């Protein structure tokens, strides 16, 4: 369990797994990244909703879309089972932060989920564990559910540093974060957008290790990394995996529909 004052090094932080209280929800989220105009987003949704007619009710379906699509999709999603998500959020409610979007702005648009700490944000835009933590706490303070992304690079995996790196991310990212309103996505960075998928059993092993570091073992933990219609059934057959964070395969209604309608093996 992440204890008080977990701001120091990993060996200063004590972890203990809590007791599970029940069945974890399945959260299937699409991350459109920097794709789709408003017109394209509406056209996608019109077709995608038809894919959900027989989707089991215990599956949470989320679309994390560009800021420019939030308003139009908020109106279009009203009354449907699809939840609206954003791809980032600032930690301040307002201020001189050119180009940023605040939690109240997202809430006003009906956003329910927000991705925080995606590897592309960390790699290309200088996100750190400190700023990730600020964003997590700000999002939760306004009732948003964060999807926290953690994962290792190819070099870290080759060096045997996968566990230490992810544990350090968790120790720093989750300071004062409410684990009852949280989703975590394990994204092996070397598998994102590369077509290389982490073996399902290995993803299950790492996600189990992530869960062992949480004081709430019922936090849903997703897998993200080249998820597609062909591998979703095998991924979701793993007992520790509670959903997926899907990139490219979420851009087409049929492929994302197949993913949310995965068939348990």
Curated annotation (Swiss-Prot):
Residues forming the catalytic site: 118 (electrophile), 187 (proton acceptor)
InterPro entries reported for this sequence: Aldolase_TIM, TIM_sf, TrioseP_Isoase_bac/euk, Triosephosphate_isomerase, Triosephosphate_isomerase_AS
Annotated pathway: Carbohydrate biosynthesis; gluconeogenesis; Carbohydrate degradation; glycolysis; D-glyceraldehyde 3-phosphate from glycerone phosphate: step 1/1
PROSITE patterns, per the entry: TIM_1 (PS00171), TIM_2 (PS51440)
GO BP annotations listed: gluconeogenesis; glyceraldehyde-3-phosphate biosynthetic process; glycerol catabolic process; glycolytic process
Main location: cytoplasm
Any Gene Ontology CC annotation: cytosol
GO molecular function: triose-phosphate isomerase activity
CDD domains: TIM (cd00311)
Binding site for substrate: 31-33, 193, 226, 247-248
Subcellular location: Cytoplasm
Function: Involved in the gluconeogenesis. Catalyzes stereospecifically the conversion of dihydroxyacetone phosphate (DHAP) to D-glyceraldehyde-3-phosphate (G3P).
Subunit structure: Homodimer.
Similarity field: Belongs to the triosephosphate isomerase family.
Protein name in the entry: Triosephosphate isomerase
Originating species: Thermosynechococcus vestitus (strain NIES-2133 / IAM M-273 / BP-1)
Phylogenetic placement of the source organism: Bacteria, Bacillati, Cyanobacteriota, Cyanophyceae, Acaryochloridales
Gene: tpiA
């Amino acid at each position: 369990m992440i204890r008080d004052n977990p701001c120091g090094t990993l060996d200063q932080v004590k972890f203990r797994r809590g007791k599970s209280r029940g069945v974890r929800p399945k959260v299937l989220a699409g991350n459109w990244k920097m794709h789709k105009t408003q017109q394209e987003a509406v056209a996608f949704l019109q077709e995608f909703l038809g894919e959900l007619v027989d989707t089991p009710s215990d599956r949470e379906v989320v679309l994390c879309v560009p800021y420019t699509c939030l308003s139009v999709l908020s109106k279009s999603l009203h009354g449907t089972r699809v939840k609206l998500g954003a791809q980032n959020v600032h930690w301040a409610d307002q201020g001189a932060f050119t180009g940023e979007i605040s939690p109240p702005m997202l809430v006003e648009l009906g956003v329910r989920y927000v991705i925080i700490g995606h590897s592309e944000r960390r790699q290309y835009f200088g996100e750190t564990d400190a700023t990730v933590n600020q964003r997590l706490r700000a999002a939760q303070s306004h009732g948003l559910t964060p999807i926290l992304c953690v994962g290792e690079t190819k070099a870290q995996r080759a060096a045997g540093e996968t566990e230490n790196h992810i544990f350090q991310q968790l120790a720093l990212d989750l300071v004062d974060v409410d684990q009852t309103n949280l989703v975590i996505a394990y994204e092996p960075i070397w598998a994102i957008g590369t077509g290389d998928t982490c073996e399902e059993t290995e993803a299950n092993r790492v996600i189990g290790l992530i869960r062992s570091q949480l004081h709430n073992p019922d936090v849903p933990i997703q897998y993200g990394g080249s998820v597609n219609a062909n591998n979703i059934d095998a991924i979701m057959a793993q007992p520790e995996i509670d959903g997926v964070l899907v990139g490219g395969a979420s851009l087409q209604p049929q492929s994302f529909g197949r993913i949310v309608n995965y068939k348990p093996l």
